[in-house]
Amino acid sequence: TILSKNAALNWGEFRINIVDTPGHSDFGGEVERILSMVDSVLLLVDAVEGPMPQTRYVTSKAFENGLRPIVMVNKIDRDASRPDWVVDQVFELFDQLGATEEQLDFPVVYGSAIQGIAGPDPDELHGDLTYLLDVIVNHVPAPEVSLDGLLQMQITSLAYDQYVGVLGVGRVKRGVINAGETIFTVSDEGKQKKGKILQVMSYAGLE
C-alpha cells in the first residue's frame, strides 16, 4: 500500500470505519495523518512468517499515538502455520517498541482473510468474520467528539469526483457537519479560504 484506502461497514448498531495505511517509513507523513484519524489499529500478521520488518514503523507510531492494538494471525490455514510462535514474536516486538502494559494486553484473533473465517483459537474458527467484528466493537473505544461548538474537521486526504469536484476525506473533531454550510479551510501555513459544503458522503464498503 502506498496511499491510504478507506472502507466502512455497519455491524449491529455500530459503524466501523476502516483505513488501510502504508507500512513503510518512506510514507511517514501519510502514516501519521491516518493514525490521527483512528481509535485503534488492527495488525495482520502472517501465521508462518510473523511480523515483517515494515511492521515496526507503523506500530511504533501507533503506540506513540496511544492506540491499543488488535492482532489477527492471518493465513492460519497454511500447513506450516505456527501461531504460538507468531504471537510470541508480536509480543516481543511490541515490548521492544515501548508498548505500555495496556497496549501489551492485546486481543488475538486467528483466521484467514481469503477464506473469510476467524475465531478465538486456531482450532476454533467460525465460518465467517463475525468473531473479528465483535472483537473490534468490544475493544475499540468510541470516538470522543463534542457536538457543541463550531464545526472542526481534520482533512487527511483529498480525492476528486468529476461530478462533485474536490472531495475532502477526514474526521469530524467537533460539531456537526451539514450540506450547505459555509466553512473556512485552513492550510498548514495557516491560510484561510472560504467555501461551502456541497454534499456530505460516507463510505459504504469500498465505495
Give the label of every model feature segment.
Residues 14-16, 21-27, 35-85:
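Conserved Switch II/interswitch segment of TRAFAC-class P-loop GTPases
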Residues 8, 30-33, 37, 54-61, ...:
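Alpha-helical scaffold elements adjacent to nucleotide-binding pockets in ATP/GTP-utilizing enzyme cores
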Residues 5-6, 28-31, 54-59, 168-170, ...:
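Short beta-alpha junctions and helix-cap segments that line functional grooves
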Residues 5, 21-23, 45-47, 75, ...:
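Fold-independent oxyanion-binding glycine-rich loops
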Residues 94-207:
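Conserved catalytic-core segments of large NTP-driven translation/proteostasis enzymes
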Residues 1, 25, 52, 118, ...:
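Gly/Ser/Thr-rich beta-alpha loop segments that engage phosphate groups in nucleotides
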Residues 1-12:
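Switch I (effector-binding) loop of TRAFAC-class P-loop GTPase G-domains
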